[in-house]
Amino acid sequence: METINNRNPQEINTNETMIENPKDKVSNNNFIPKLNLNNNNLNKINQPGDSETLDNRSNPSSPIESPLSTARISSSHNILFKTRGYYFIKPISKGGYGQVFLAITKSNKFFAIKSINKRDTIGKHMVKELMVERNILVQYQNQSIVKLFECFQTKKKLYMVMEFLHGGDCASLLHSLNTLEEREAKNIIAQIVNGLEFIHSCGIIHRDLKVENLIFDKNGIIKIVDFGFSEVGFTGNSIKNGNKKNNKCLGTPYYMSPEVINKRGYGKTIDWWALGIIIFELLSGETPFVGDNQNMIFEKITNYTNEINFPSYFSEVAIDLIQKLLQVDPLKRLGANGADEVKRHPFFNGVNWSKIYSPESLTFKPKIENEYDSSYFFERENVKKTVSAKKTNNKKPIKRYLFKGFNFKKN
C-alpha cells in the first residue's frame, strides 16, 4: 500500500514576500493534523501518536506524531469577550475584511462568527461587498455553502453568525500533508465543481476562490465561504466588461485570471481558472504563479501562454484538466459552457456525481473530539493577501444608514 505523501514534492519557495503564502509562516500552537483519509482501500490515519511525522513514516496504519503542538481549548472555555449572548472563545481565521471567531452560547451551541469593523469597512469602500455576502448567504441555502444564522451590529462592529465547520480549510490540510495524491484529491475537487455549479446557477461569481475559502464540515463535506468579493447578476455565460460595469481588481493575486488583472471583462470562467490553480496546488503543494510581490505575480499571469512546468508525478489526465482550466482565452476555458463539460473531463472518470457526498465517497474524514474542536485550523501569522479598494482615512462618525438592512435572524 502506497503511503500518503511518500514522494518528494517540488521545493516550496519559503522566501518572505509581500503577499505571504500561509505555508511560509505558521504559528503551531493550535493545530493537530488528526487526518483520516478514506478513499476506498486507502488506509486510515489515526490520532497522532509517539514516533513518526507525517512525511517520514513507513507504516501508514501506525500512530503518527505531529511535529506541531497539541495545545487545545480547555473545557472551561476561556472567554475573550461577549456580545448579544455569544461568548467568543478564540479566533480561527481571517476573511477578506473580517476576523472569524469560535463562539459559544449559554445553551452550549457553537458558531463561527465573523467580526467586522464598521470604520474599516467604510474606509476600504467595502460596504457594498459586505451586503452582497450577507444577501447571498441569506437568500441561498445549499450543502456547498456555509449556513448563516444571524446578522447583528453594535455601534462599532458588525457580526455574521455562521455554522462552525470543524474540519478546517484546504490550506490547513495542505499544511499537514503538503500534497495530496490524485485519488485522494478527486472527491475534494468534485465537491468544489459541484459547489461552483450551484453558485453559478444562481448568477453568482465568487471571485476569491482559494484553498482558504474551502472548509470541511465534521463529515468531510466542503463548504464554500467568504463571499465578500462575489458578484451577482450573471446569467448564462455572460461576460461583464470590467471597464464599464466594474473596474475593481478584486481577489487574491495567486488565483486571479488574466482578464481580471487586465480589466478586460470577466464572467463565470474566472472561478474555473481559480479551480485550475487550486487543483495544481492540491497536487503539488504550491500555486503555479509565484513572485516576490504582487506585481511580479501579476506579470507572470498576464504573460502566461498556456504553458506550465508540471511536476513529473502529475498524471497526463490531471495535466490536461489543469491546462484546460488555465486557458488564457476565457471563452475557450473549460467551464465556459457550464459545469457539465468540466464533469465530463476524463479526470473524473469513475466519479458518481450523485453520490459524491456519501460517506463511502468522501476522502477526508475529520476525527472530531468535541463540538468545540478547532484543531484542524492552523493559525496563520501571515495569509495570502487579497487585492481590494485602497483604504481611505475616515474618522467621521459612522453613519447608521450605511448598514441599514444588515440585521437578520434565521427562523
UniProtKB/Swiss-Prot annotation:
Coiled coil residues, start to end: none
Biological process terms in GO annotation: intracellular signal transduction
Positions of ATP binding: I92, S93, K94, G95, G96, Y97, G98, Q99, V100, K114
Skewed-composition ranges (Low complexity): 28-46
Assigned EC number: 2.7.11.1
Reactions catalysed, as given in the entry: L-seryl-[protein] + ATP = O-phospho-L-seryl-[protein] + ADP + H(+); L-threonyl-[protein] + ATP = O-phospho-L-threonyl-[protein] + ADP + H(+)
Span list, region Disordered: 1-69
Family: Belongs to the protein kinase superfamily. AGC Ser/Thr protein kinase family.
Protein name: Probable serine/threonine-protein kinase DDB_G0280717
